[in-house]
Every structure is written in C-alpha cells, then in structure tokens.
A protein has these predicted regions:
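Conserved catalytic or regulatory cores that recognize and/or transform ribose-phosphate-containing ligands
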Residues: 2-249
Length: 249
C-alpha cells in the first residue's frame, strides 16, 4: 500500500495547513454537509455560533471526556440563548464519519473553510464561543474547594466504570496525575492547538468585516470566552498558531 502523501492547502483567508491527501474528499464532503446543516438552522431565523473547545487529549486529557464536555457546553450555551433562537456548531459532534484517523491539520483545514464561509467574511456565523476553565469546572461540578482532589476522585470513578477509559490508563495513554493537572489547571482553549487557530480565524474574519461596507464594526462576530463577552482590544489581537502551517519538505 502506498504511503499517504501530504500537501499544503490554503483557505480563502490564507490559512494554510499540511493536509493528508487521503482525506481531501472526506473534508470536501463534510464542508458541504455542515454548510447545509447551518443553512437549515439559518432558515429558521436562528443566530449561528461556533464552539471552540479542546478535543485532543494533548496535555493529559481524554478525547472521550473532552467530547462529553463539548456536548455539555454546547447544550449550556444553547439553553442560555434559547434553542428556538440559537444553534451552536459543536465540532465534537460534526467532524464527519469519514475523518477517523485524521490529524489536527486535516480537521482545521475543514473547519477553517466552514468558519470563513464562501466569501471569507464568516457570513454563516453570528458568534464564536471559546470554552474556558469555568465551562470545564461546571462539567466536573468543581466548587472551588479541593478541586484537584475532586478530579482525582472523578478519575477513579470513571476508571472503575468505563472499560475503555481503564484500558487507556493501563496502556499509559492517560494518567491520574496528568488528568488531574490538565482539567484542574489547564483545561481551556488557551492550551489547544485547534482553538489557537480558531481564535486567529475569528480575528481575521472580524478584520475583514471591519473593512467591508456591508458589515463594518457594528456587524463583527460576537466573541465569548468562558461565558463572557471578549473586549475589542482582546479579540483584535492574534495568538500563536496551532495546527496552521505549510508542509515542510
């Protein structure tokens, strides 16, 4: 079997990724599918959001747990805004069933196209929501008292009840201390490769909107972090790239 090849692919706003060419058709198909999903909700008059949330286990977390947190956060944001009036795109739920084994750059090339929209102004979206420490704390029911100990207890209970989680513990892909420290000290978009790119995408979209006669400052994307609106001085600043970057030959 021939080895997979990689290729640099760039989006309308010039975000470039080193993409595994085996996933190009799957990416194109899911971009079209998710755009259709968004269009259906827009046709109902809903405000459309995007949830930026860590999904990778990088740093000590668990993909399965992160996916559960993403779903819980999406549900919480939807409840806050009203399900009849808003819909939020959860990347943990809409990654596509043909993307198994894909890497971060493959996923980000896909999400970047969806977020930018056909015109590069993020015209399908009204707001971005970046998950933060309090979103994670809410999932684990942390109280601000003995939080790391609560996370250790949560880890022990999950390992006792979930065979796949216990398997990950046994093979060393997740550890009690790593889990505790990640979710207790670093659980946030601040430590996510993909979310770093999401932030820069939101910034680029708003920069384009500010300079467009049909958008302008008044019609920028609303940006939320950890449940609160972000100030203009913050969301106009870039952050370090995550998965974005050209292939190195």
């Amino acid at each position: 079997m021939a080895a997979s090849s990689t290729v640099t692919l760039c989006t309308r706003l010039d975000f470039c990724y080193c993409v595994n060419s085996d996933y190009r058709d799957a990416i194109d198909a899911n971009v079209a599918r998710v755009r259709g999903l968004i269009a259906g909700h827009k046709a109902q008059g809903k405000a459309i959001g995007y949830l930026s949330v860590p999904l990778s286990p990088a740093g000590g977390g668990s993909f399965a747990v992160n996916a559960e947190i993403a779903a819980a956060t999406a549900s919480s944001v939807t409840a806050r805004l009203g399900a009849q009036s808003a819909w939020i795109l959860n990347p943990g739920a809409e990654g596509g069933d043909r993307m198994n084994g894909a890497g971060g750059a493959d996923f980000m090339y896909m999400w970047t196209q969806i977020l930018e929209g056909r015109n590069g102004a993020g015209e399908d979206f009204d707001f971005f929501y970046f998950a933060g420490p309090f979103d994670f704390a809410s999932f684990f029911k942390l109280t601000g008292q003995g939080d790391l100990e609560r996370l250790e207890a949560w880890f022990d209970a999950r390992a006792a009840q979930d065979p796949s989680f216990m398997t990950a513990v046994d093979n060393g892909s997740i550890t009690r201390a790593g889990f505790r420290n990640y979710y207790g000290l670093r659980a946030s978009v601040a430590f996510s490769y993909g979310s770093h790119d999401d932030w820069n995408i939101a910034r680029a979209i708003n920069a384009r909107r500010r300079g467009a006669a049909d958008f302008g400052i008044a019609n920028q994307l609303a940006i939320f972090f950890d449940g609160h609106p972000v100030t203009p001085g913050s969301y106009e600043e870039p952050t370090a790239a995550g998965d974005a970057g050209r292939c190195v030959k």
